[in-house]
Amino acid sequence: MSVINCEEVKRDEFHTEKYYESYNIFGAHIVTEDEMRGVRFTVWAPHAKAMSVVGDFNEWDYEQHKMLQVTEEGIWSLFIPHIEEREIYKYAIETMAGDVIFKADPYAVYAEVRPNTASVVFDIKGYEWNDKNWSRKKKKKSVYKEAMTVYELHFGSWKKKEDGTLYSYREMAEELIPYVVEHQFTHIEIMPLVEHPYDRSWGYQGTGYYAATSRFGTPYDLMHFVDECHKYGIGVILDWVPGHFCKDAHGLYLFDGTPTYEYKDKDVQENPVWGTVNFDLGKREVRNFLISNALFWMRYFHIDGFRVDAVANMLYWNKEGQEQSNEHAVSFLRELNEAVFAEDEDFLMTAEDSTAWPLVTAPTYEGGLGFNYKWNMGWMNDVLKYMECAPEYRKYIHDKMTFSLLYAYSENFILPLSHDEVVHGKKSLLNKMPGDYWDKFAQLRLLYGYFFTHPGKKLLFMGGEFGQFDEWKDLEDLDWNLHDFEMHRYMHDYFKELIALYKRSKPLWQLDHSREGFQWIDANNNEQSIFSFIRQGDKQEDALVVVCNFTKATYENYKVGVPDFEYYNEILNSDAEQYGGSGQVNKKRLKTIQEPYHNQTAHVEITIPPFGVSILRPVKTRKGSKKQDGSKTKVRSNVTSRGKR
């Protein structure tokens, strides 16, 4: 049995320096050594007394294939000839206390289907990709100045087979991708696909960070799924959890009988609410494990982005009852983002962060954490609280709908209507809306209208597009039978039209991260709970006027100040009958009245629909947006541009 030498291990790099290809050393690799084909097993267990490899090939006898310690810092390795792909195995670890524990391989790229927990030998290097066109197109676009609509989903509960079993990665490619294309989503965001033992953890409590969960098939099957997404122009974002991991006996927890991947200090090690433990982000070997893992998913699975989970829990730790910043985590996140963007400058790194930590999406060289997007949790919480309030009382919390614009350009934001808000008794988005059946649908259409016209990229959890009535049930699939009901079909039609309008309307996304992209017309009409604003594109003539009415009242001849174009057309009204509304729409072309109003040089008079959003577009009567008197239209603005990145 041959042994890897210290040069192969790159000992100094793994233990003391940045080494982001640790998956090339550790794990189970099919190789030929001394003219014999077999598997090289390598693992880091710094406090193990002895190590061995066990599996069906030796009847799980830990006395047969003893590993050799090849570095003082605890790297163990062994080559076993004649072992083939798909062989299952674990590491048997004799602890310093004299106990023998059995662990899955932290670097395994494949694992048994739960409830079994062994690792599986698998050659991950053979998939032939067909997504060069996708890569070329992605590099031609600026992620910051493009439309972004993200469909968040849980792979196991989007849709199930008639017998209740799960679709495979390949079957989901056939089922999901046409649906996503039909709805014109630009990306899908999948809740964690790393190997995890408990279905109801939704993947957030992982045991195998390098192993795509075998619930849905092999690593090649997932590669095929991503390849097909790219073929149809869909980016793939994965939820990724570098902050904490589960305590299942076969996983990373107390890997060699002592805290190895987690902090030693119990005060900062444990997450009592989740029942997990925190990664020791101050330890070089752990950083190399995690950052190598991020690059592994990028290189082997061609992932387009990560949504980094629970960043707030990483940035702060509650030690001895006092909330303190975790400098290990701050340093780690900066190092992570630098490594990711060095690999792919067009990658999406999104922080799920509910804190007010500054400069989350600023580059590290400017003192930031280095992400390029952050979920706008403040917007989500304020807007949903406002929508859940009875309409007649909304005027008393008017500022919840305007406050977000005070900080909308402090970070690059994604507006999330995510899974977190439609589970654990929080109700579905539709059922959060107060009032009767009609009112609920009208207000959800209104919410979506405000969502798509507010600055920031968009994310919606599955089922929201057709008005899922029940909250998310993670052990079942979506209520697809709701399409049998008229109001849900109307909702679905409305959503598809709204997202199509968003994608073809540059003012709704081109300046998402610049103050020049948004201007209030009237932010202060709390008595009627009506908001009006302008969304602006790169060109002065690219402007849309948006009016939102958050009560059930209808208003005729309502004055709205507008940029001085000669005419406006209403291009979308959420109260249209084809969407299930009452039909209070503005069918005719709206002629501007040359009288200043709302700090604009002109105004129009429109019908304001109940619980409705109306989007107006200026009619460009001449090239260059000139009016009949020959002057050129300008949009009034008292703000300056501050783009990000």
From Swiss-Prot:
Catalytic activity, as annotated: Transfers a segment of a (1->4)-alpha-D-glucan chain to a primary hydroxy group in a similar glucan chain
CDD domains: AmyAc_Glg_BE (cd11322), E_set_GBE_prok_N (cd02855)
EC number: 2.4.1.18
Pathway, per record: Glycan biosynthesis; glycogen biosynthesis
Spans annotated as Disordered: 619-645
GO annotations of cellular component type: cytosol
Keyword annotations: Carbohydrate metabolism, Glycogen biosynthesis, Glycogen metabolism, Glycosyltransferase, Transferase
GO biological process: glycogen biosynthetic process
NCBIfam families (alphabetical): branching_enzym, PRK05402.1, PRK12313.1
HAMAP family per the UniProt record, alphabetical: GlgB
Family of this protein: Belongs to the glycosyl hydrolase 13 family. GlgB subfamily.
Protein name as catalogued: 1,4-alpha-glucan branching enzyme GlgB
Taxonomic source organism: Bacillus cereus (strain AH820)
